[in-house]
């Protein structure tokens, strides 16, 4: 930690979040589930050829899953040779792709779904009625008994286009029934690591408070204080958006925008609701940063004296997946973009902080819980507590979100700089 002694730390706050998690010893579930086989590939739009990001990738009949990265690429590991993968994304027809035996990466092309004219009549529906009915049906649509999820979490910070901080963790998430609040939902870290830029010129670093407890605090269907409650929804103007599909299932799309002026920023966004079950399946939110002072108070937890903070963007994506008659949390991603400068300096510097977590496996009948003493506190940060390591095989045997090309280059750069010291 000596190289970080002169750094100035900027601390930003995720919605609903207090802190990252503290380190812990590995749970017994850890190394016993190391996965030996893998399939690698990319997902593209069949018409445009554009790579598709944050696409759900799973093994049919199994519970292993991941998402594509922002380059549209994925690696999915299993305990036996995979025969095919199932790929699904909002607005596209789902597709099963056969895994080749030669080990070459797959290129999977998804066809955009064409909504029939008769289905556009959904525009006449009442958005508030859909949301209130969906809230009443949460107890029927989501898990009714505790489950244990294996997750992968990553947080990064970039100064302009350069990565200055990377932290990752494999976690266990104990998720209780949606008829209860999240007081018993807990996370324990199986394995984690931290990578930092060793350059002394990186005098400003970013600490994101949020971390692996992401999947507890930002499960918006369970934690309704944030958005999905009648008092909060009354603050928004709503209208029906164009319908779409997720996992080959028709979805209502409800568009939100701030409807009143209050002493805190509200969101623009879309809420997706399964047309048949009325389960929430996807929530996209973007913070209204038009009032810079309010947005700064909302986003920023702590900053050094003399530093000027300019919020640019804060977005949140929460995905749920329908399977075997039950809808479950599958992926959460939060992105901060902001600029900082010091007083009396002419130019400012742009920063981006990203946190994401994906559920990669689940146990529907766990034999144990995560005890309170094993659970991670929400008052710490991986920035402070995760071990610093540059082991190239650190995640061997675990499902993770495949690093993007730019992230891989950043890690390789850190390897080289570390070896030169």
Positions of PLM-derived features:
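Beta-strand-rich domain onsets/edges
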Residues: 28-38
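A short, amphipathic beta-strand motif
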Residues: 37-45, 72, 108, 120
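Short, ordered, surface-exposed loop/turn motifs in non-cytosolic proteins
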Residues: 37-39, 46-61
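Short Pro-Gly-centered beta-turn/loop motif in secreted/extracellular proteins
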Residues: 49, 75-82
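A short, solvent-exposed loop/turn motif at the edges and junctions
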Residues: 59, 86-97
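Short, acidic Ser/Thr/Gly-rich low-complexity loop/linker segments typical of extracellular
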Residues: 63-73
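Surface-exposed, low-complexity/disordered segments
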Residues: 109-236, 247-250, 299-300, 305-421
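Extended beta-strand-rich segments in extracellular/periplasmic secretory proteins, especially
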Residues: 224-275, 279-286, 321
């Amino acid at each position: 930690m000596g190289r970080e002694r002169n750094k100035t730390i900027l601390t930003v706050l995720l919605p609903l979040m207090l802190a990252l998690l503290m380190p812990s010893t590995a749970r017994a579930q850890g190394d016993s589930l190391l996965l030996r086989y893998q399939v690698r590939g990319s997902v593209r739009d069949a018409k445009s050829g554009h790579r598709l990001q944050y696409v759900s990738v799973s093994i049919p009949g199994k519970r292993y899953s991941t998402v594509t990265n922002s380059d549209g690429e994925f690696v999915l590991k299993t305990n036996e040779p995979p025969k095919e993968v199932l790929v699904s994304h909002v607005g596209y027809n789902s597709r099963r792709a056969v895994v080749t035996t030669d080990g070459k990466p797959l290129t999977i092309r998804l066809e955009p779904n064409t909504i029939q004219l008769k289905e556009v009549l959904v525009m006449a529906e009442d958005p508030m009625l859909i949301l209130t009915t969906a809230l009443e049906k949460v107890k029927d649509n989501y898990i009714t008994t505790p489950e244990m999820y294996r997750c992968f979490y990553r947080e990064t910070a970039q100064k302009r286009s350069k990565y200055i901080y990377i932290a990752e963790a494999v976690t266990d998430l104990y998720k209780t029934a949606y008829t209860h609040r999240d007081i018993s939902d807990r996370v324990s870290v199986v394995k984690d690591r931290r990578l930092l830029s060793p350059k002394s010129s990186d005098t400003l670093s970013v600490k994101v408070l949020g971390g692996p407890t992401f999947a507890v605090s930002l499960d918006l269907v369970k934690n309704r204080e944030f958005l999905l409650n009648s008092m909060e929804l009354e603050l928004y103007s709503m209208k029906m958006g164009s319908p779409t599909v997720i996992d080959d299932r028709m979805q209502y799309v409800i568009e939100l925008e701030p409807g009143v002026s209050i002493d805190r920023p509200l969101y623009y966004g879309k809420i997706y609701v399964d047309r048949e079950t009325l389960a929430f399946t996807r929530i996209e939110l973007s913070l209204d940063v038009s009032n810079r002072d309010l947005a700064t108070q909302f986003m920023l937890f702590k900053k050094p004296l003399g530093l000027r903070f300019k919020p640019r963007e804060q977005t949140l994506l929460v995905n749920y997946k329908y399977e075997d008659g039950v809808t479950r949390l599958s992926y959460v991603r939060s992105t901060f973009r902001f600029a900082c400068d010091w007083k009396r300096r002419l130019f400012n510097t742009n920063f981006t902080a990203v946190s994401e977590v994906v559920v990669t496996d689940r146990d529907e009948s766990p034999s144990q819980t995560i005890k309170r003493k094993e659970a991670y506190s929400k008052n710490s940060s991986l920035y402070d507590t995760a071990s610093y390591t540059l082991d190239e095989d650190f995640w061997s045997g675990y499902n993770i979100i495949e690093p993007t090309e730019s992230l891989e280059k950043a890690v390789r750069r850190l390897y080289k700089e570390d070896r030169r010291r």
